[in-house]
Amino acid sequence: MEELQGYLEKDRSRQQYFLYPLLFQEYIYVFAYDHGLNSSIFYEPANFGGYDNKSSSVLVKRLIIRMYQQNYFIYSVNDSYQNRFVGHNNYFYSHFFSQMISEGFAVIVEIPFSLQLVSSLEEKKIPKSHNLQSIHSIFPFLXDKFSHLNYLSDILIPHPIHMEILVQILQSWIQDVPSLHLLRFFLYEYYNWNSLITPKKSIYVFSKENKRLFWFLYNSYVSECEFLLVFLRKQSSYLRLTSFGAFLERTHFYGKIEHLVVCRNFFQNTLWVFKDPFMHYVRYQGKAILGSRGTHFQMKKWKCHFVNFWQYYYHFWSQPCRIHINQLSNYSFYFRGYLSSVLINSSAVRNQMLENSFIMDIFTKKFDTIVPIIPLVRSSSKAKFCTVSGHPISKSIWTDLSDCDIINRFGRICRNLSHYHSGSSKKQSLHRMKYILRLSCARTLARKHKSTVRSFLQRLSSGLLEEFFTEEEQVLSLIFPKITSFYLHGSYRERIWYLDIIRINDLVNNL
């Protein structure tokens, strides 16, 4: 990494113009390997002919030698089309090397954005906080802010989009023409490959073999979708922000600046609609939430501008039905595995003034989060832990494992699920999921040993109970021994948010 920074420090003002030569450097692929992505080809060599990590450097050197050859990419494309279903070595090497290049290319295109982020944090003197990376850090923010809001908009980022738009988005940041041509080559290659397997598959669906590159493109696309929100929010702010000028100096292409100028001039006349200091925006992956303390008319104006901006900027129908406006007091929204709502609690207070007494009704708002059982059962059914109705079944593909591995896998899933959903105010859904996983584990062991479930439950009842006893339950049993029994029966309503969760639970991610 130091060598990479030294290369870029030679000419920081023109660092975005010399990204393509980095593709011929061996340390770029080593750096991609060190990132530790599970989808990396270096971590899954079994899918590519049984190569191990020791031979990765040899493959990288062989790849660099081939890239120096003239018309290498043209030959690789022809080989991939001719031998796609034959299974010849030519197709194997072309497809394998193409994935290696995409891994290295993903590292290269991240360089300008990473350096810009680091310099921005240093300039604004923003301390690095790993706790803010936690998914659970979103919910305390919602509890503090959304309980005072009136309306909420559920926004689904529009898709699919044309592949050329993805290239054009990066063109405003990276002006290295060979790199953009290479990106276009990757997109069309994998689009043609996916179209032969599933004709209706869009480039929006990420390839398992190139997750890093496609996640980067998707994040770039989402940041462009949020451009209107950031632009209007900063325009309507009472105090001008220091980073506002960066958005006006952006380079736009193919005449689309004309649409933006028209929209910007039109926005100047309607900015009074958006002068709302209580506007809050939260997004995770493809779903966003926009909350406001204003009126329903203001939320409709926001929706209108979102739809028009996306339609003009991306030249496709932006699907207005993907934005739903609801009154927060009468609406529960599903976000990251939690069903959240604002509860209104009323309490009667008796006031005494001299000889007169009267009763006042006081209403308080509380942000509540619960775990819905139906999505969890549906997700568990997809993972083959239970039926659609929630009846536990055996995990047949795990019967070849040892008993210890089977119990550890089920226990780890149960602990992760309880850990992620520890912020729920009601624990009945978690206890039911724990029962499903525990009985599914017993059925898997019974199927492996060709025995009955009852015999295994009698033999391993205490062991399974300890394995499925979660960490927070153990802590609560030590701190509050008297309430542990109530907690196990679902009466404990204390919510716990963890600031070390940077990855969503697999059962929630399948929804």
From Swiss-Prot:
Organism listed in the record: Ensete lasiocarpum
Function: Usually encoded in the trnK tRNA gene intron. Probably assists in splicing its own and other chloroplast group II introns.
Top-level taxonomy: Eukaryota, Viridiplantae, Streptophyta, Embryophyta, Tracheophyta
HAMAP family, per database record: MatK
Family assignment from sequence similarity: Belongs to the intron maturase 2 family. MatK subfamily.
Name of the protein described by the UniProt record: Maturase K
Keyword tRNA processing tagged: yes
Keywords, sorted A to Z: Chloroplast, mRNA processing, Plastid, RNA-binding, tRNA processing
Cell compartment(s), UniProt: Plastid, Chloroplast
Principal cellular location given in the protein's record: plastid
GO terms for cellular component: chloroplast
GO BP: mRNA processing; RNA splicing; tRNA processing
GO function terms (MF aspect): RNA binding
Domain of life assignment: Eukaryota
InterPro entries: Domain_X, Maturase_MatK, Maturase_MatK_N
Record keyword Nucleus present: no
